[in-house]
Amino acid sequence: MLLLNHLQKKDQSLLSAMNNDAPFQFLPGFTQLYHEYMEENIFIAYSEKLMAFMPLRFFSSRFFKLAQILHAPIKNNIELNPQEQLDFFNELISYLNQNNSCERLVQPHPYGILASVPANSRFCEFGTYIIDLQTQTKEEIFQKFHPKYQKAIHHSEKNGAVVKFGQDVLNDFYLCYTDTMKRISMPSEELQFFKSYYNYLGSDNVTAGVVYDNDNPIGGIFMIHSNYAALCTHAGSRGE
């Protein structure tokens, strides 16, 4: 097992396979974002036995050195099967223990779903929505929406709603997002958080989208993506 870092020249040869066909958590810009903006370190764990990679976030709490798995391990940009994932985790845990790298592995983000769980872990089952965009047309995807949402979309189109994408609509997305977080009494990220994703990953990997009604922003999403997948990480709407 090796811990590699995009910011270390000695590791760049092994990490050269981490291109835009990989999940965005494996990309150099993501490592740089966490290092410079979050002031945390991202390492790519590499199993020489399995020839597979997995991103890890290292950080500290008041009492513990922690590591967070950010995505399931992959080989040739394909997730390992459940048994291979378990083998990877066991090898990783042994390495982290031997090197005193961290004292606890914490749960991944909701978009970091794993197929296996290391022995003696505390865990819960979790599901998320995954839509295959390669094998379906836009019309086929739309027909799978709940009829209520199909009707709402048709109504918006009929009344002149406009959807815009790109960094230019980031401020309007933020209005929608913070309105929602206030309504549910939850803390929100700062605007600079979203700007930093654009700064480090660029428009090839980050997209904000906003729907407008009479030029007023009424809903927005924030997507982080690569050729591997697009993930909606934040969203919100204005009004009731």
Task: Indicate where each model-derived feature is located.
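Conserved GNAT acetyl-CoA-binding A-motif
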Residues: Q98-H109
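Acidic, aromatic-enriched beta-alpha/helix-loop junctions
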Residues: A72-N76, Q85, N97
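A conserved beta-strand-loop-helix scaffold within acyl/acetyltransferase catalytic domains
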Residues: L2-F63, P108-I131, Q136-E240
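Intrinsic-disorder-associated interaction segments
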Residues: Q8, P23, I78, P82-Q85
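Conserved acetyl-CoA-binding loop-helix of GNAT-fold acetyltransferases
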Residues: P82-S94, E240
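Surface-exposed alpha-helical segments enriched in charged/polar residues
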Residues: N90-N97, H154, N199
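Glycine-/proline-rich flexible loop or hinge segments
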Residues: F64-L80
